[in-house]
Amino acid sequence: MSNRTFQRGDPIGHAFADPALLAQALRHRSAGTPHNERLEFLGDGIVNLLIAEALYHRWPKADEGALTRARAELVREGALAVIGRTLNLGERLTLGPGELKSGGHRRDSILADAVEAIVAAIYLDCGFERCRAVVLPWFEASLAALPVGKAEKDPKTRLQEWLQARQLPLPTYALISESGDEHAKQFHVACILEQPVARAEGQGTSRRLAEQQAATLVIAQLDSNT
């Protein structure tokens, strides 16, 4: 197949004219340069655009809030990591010795970043139209599973709306600790309510994920008391 990098049955579904793009997309910063962080940055924007466009056309009657929640659900770290596993990225990543030893090829954050980097690599290799044609099928099952126009609100939003409906003070999110290397951060956050009095702690690979987990646990406390 000319000089393109492609293996029959490759779940990525694209034959790279420039093999260096794919190699860089799969190279974690722990393995040295050129790594995939710049590609990840570009890919994040492209994925958000692709999903926003798909939802806009599929849900013609959905309001902005429903579209935003649906996009957030589809592009969250965990959802992208599932795609990364479907594409068998874990076994193809180039990792440094430390990440190899700690099981970085299984970590959601690394897999999600690699998915975004590969999206950018495809875009740079062949343009937006081809990128859309290759990437959207990765999300098809998740898109089809979403109730039309009724994507579930994230825990922080649900908690905020529960409190606002009762005219109660909004929660406070406090960072307890931040640990780990730059490429493998762990955040420990507390969600604190004044009224009703409640507190829960969450952890995650980003502060947002830790806050969402803490909010989920506070909601569970509120549900158990009603």
From Swiss-Prot:
Q: Does the keyword RNA-binding apply?
A: yes
Q: What residues form the catalytic site here? A: 44, 116
Span of domain RNase III: 5-127
Give the UniProt keywords, A-Z: Cytoplasm, Endonuclease, Hydrolase, Magnesium, Metal-binding, mRNA processing, Nuclease, RNA-binding, rRNA processing, rRNA-binding, tRNA processing
- The EC number of this protein is 3.1.26.3
Q: Which GO terms describe its cellular component?
A: cytoplasm
Q: Which GO terms describe its molecular function?
A: double-stranded RNA binding; metal ion binding; ribonuclease III activity; rRNA binding
Biological processes annotated in GO: mRNA processing; regulation of gene expression; rRNA processing; tRNA processing
Protein residues bound to Mg(2+): 40, 113, 116
Q: Which residues form the DRBM domain?
A: 154-224
InterPro entries listed in its UniProt record:
dsRBD_dom (IPR014720), RNase_III (IPR011907), RNase_III_dom (IPR000999), RNase_III_sf (IPR036389)
Query: What domain of life does the UniProt record list for this protein's source?
Result: Bacteria
Q: What is its main location?
A: cytoplasm
What is catalysed by this protein?
Endonucleolytic cleavage to 5'-phosphomonoester
The protein's matches in Pfam families, at most eight in alphabetical order, are given as: dsrm (PF00035), Ribonucleas_3_3 (PF14622)
Q: Where in the cell is it found?
A: Cytoplasm
Record bears the keyword Lipid metabolism? no
Cofactor names from the entry are: Mg(2+)
Q: Please describe what this protein does.
A: Digests double-stranded RNA. Involved in the processing of primary rRNA transcript to yield the immediate precursors to the large and small rRNAs (23S and 16S). Processes some mRNAs, and tRNAs when they are encoded in the rRNA operon. Processes pre-crRNA and tracrRNA of type II CRISPR loci if present in the organism.
What does the subunit section of this Swiss-Prot or TrEMBL entry state? Homodimer.
Family membership, please give it.
Belongs to the ribonuclease III family.
Query: What NCBIfam families has UniProt attached to this entry?
Result: RNaseIII
Q: What is this protein called?
A: Ribonuclease 3
Q: Which organism is it from?
A: Xanthomonas axonopodis pv. citri (strain 306)
